[in-house]
Amino acid sequence: MATQLIDLAQQTRAAAQKLGTLSLAQRNDALAKVAQALAANQAKIVAANQADCEAAQRDGIAPALYARLKLGESKLQGAIAGIHDVINLPDPVGHLQLHRELDQDLVLKRVTCPLGVLGIIFEARPEALIQITSLAIKSGNGVILKGGKEAIQSCTVLTEIIQTALQDTAVSPQAVTLLTTREEIKTLLSLDQYVDLIIPRGSNAFVQYVQQNTTIPVLGHADGVCHLYVDVAADLSKTIPIVVDAKTQYPAACNAVETLLIHEKIAPEFLPQIAAALTAKQVTLRGDAATQKIMPVQPATAEDWRTEYSDLVLAIKIVPDVEAAIAHINTYGSKHTDGIITEDAATAQIFLNEVKAAGVYHNCSTRFADGFRYGFGAEVGISTQTLPPRGPVGLEGLVTYKYHLVGNGQIAATYSGPDAKPFTHRDL
């Protein structure tokens, strides 16, 4: 199996090298044909996904994972529309970032270029395959995909349709490869000679496993423990819809809020209101001791502050001020997305400056942490690392850059020693 996978990786790398040289028009043409093929085969895709869903239900799949697995017509159509959004995005390849004369006839350029081959490992979410493949092709990268076993039929059908569509384009079908067995993950993680970036999308434990078992750079986040802090100066009529949306609009999402922090001065008034709104949406509430004194809720433990529920569960804590809220978030948060609700601009700015997260919001739902909503067309994942790329990662995170230096016989010795010729260092 290892030898076969190495052969596939070599083929993908060769296809990626050619893909990286194609024009924007050629890459966009390939994407348009992929979108057309997916649209023409919607019934086939939905049927394959339905078979996956039925098998998953027989196996007792968790509700949060089932929600990710389910690919209905609307979700599929949204993914196809996302391909057209990617087509309309600027070309990330060949972008001139620096153009500088070092000396006469010695010119330096920094130019963006594809990474090479992406290894994408994801659980459930078959539409992620569509999003990632479109971004990979647009950015000139090959991609090796490994979906979860629960989505095997969906991913197989999607990949077959995409590869068939690419046969009529300048992009080789071998630029997109699908792995189908769990055993292949370990081998994939060892292919640092052929794979340039690993992007895992899945549970906390799964992402940590990937991070700990490869020498290939990893882009991703291990969990999404997101917070909202309701300040003493919050407009409660604005606050309730924000909190309800952040928790219930899609609770399985990594940008759904998991902990609600409330300023102690407004807690007696606000808690009953938000509790009524959330329980009407079947949300289970867990609270600290101060919360329990105001209303009956399940006790929150220390473990709750670190938990990504991915479900209709919300932990609540009452805090004395914004600094306490920031301290809690920076201690227990996952550096994903955290927000403040307040009409006090100075307090909001303190929060925006001091919370150590990829996304820090003011007066809006955490659910906006998404590449599509940011106008990236789609995203390959969300990175919570401090170094870039950070937050929702779209095309800009799938390219690197190289330096082109064009001279006319210059040598380094001319520019060193007591009679060194000075550089001009003039931006062009």
Swiss-Prot record:
Its main location: cytoplasm. Keywords: Amino-acid biosynthesis, Cytoplasm, NADP, Oxidoreductase, Proline biosynthesis. One of its GO terms (cellular component) is cytoplasm. Pathway: Amino-acid biosynthesis; L-proline biosynthesis; L-glutamate 5-semialdehyde from L-glutamate: step 2/2. It comes from the Bacteria. It is an enzyme of class 1 (oxidoreductase). One of its GO terms (biological process) is L-proline biosynthetic process. One of its GO terms (molecular function) is NADP binding. Its EC number is 1.2.1.41. It is found in: Cytoplasm. Catalyzes the NADPH-dependent reduction of L-glutamate 5-phosphate into L-glutamate 5-semialdehyde and phosphate. The product spontaneously undergoes cyclization to form 1-pyrroline-5-carboxylate. Belongs to the gamma-glutamyl phosphate reductase family. This is Gamma-glutamyl phosphate reductase. It comes from Picosynechococcus sp. (strain ATCC 27264 / PCC 7002 / PR-6).
